[in-house]
């Protein structure tokens, strides 16, 4: 079964600047930061009819993370290691949300994992 991309993050040192940039360049509707400092990007901006959700947040280094829906994040991390990748973030239960993890491919590109 093909695993769909279900979420993305765009992070950097100045999330206010990032919010404004993406609002302007793509016309995205982006919420103001929630108590966790995360601004959610509204659905329906393209792609599948339901859209792909996203967030703007503070990160030490700028990066975009695409999240792929998987059945078991821990099992997927183990598979990534077996294929030459590495763990970036162990599985973590987001308060009131899903279990997420991050891996890097053999070239170092970070991919997020979210439990289906």
Task: Give the positions of each predicted feature.
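N-terminal beta-strand motif that seeds the catalytic metal site of vicinal oxygen chelate
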Residues: 1-19, 64-66, 115-116
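Short coil/loop residues immediately preceding or within conserved phosphate-binding loops
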Residues: 5, 51, 98
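N-terminal first-folded block
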Residues: 7-43
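Vicinal oxygen chelate
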Residues: 10, 77-78, 83-116
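Short alpha-helical
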Residues: 16-17, 74-75, 98
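Conserved short beta-strand elements that form part of the metal-binding/catalytic scaffold
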Residues: 28-62, 110-115
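Mid-chain, well-packed structural core segment of small domains
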Residues: 59-87
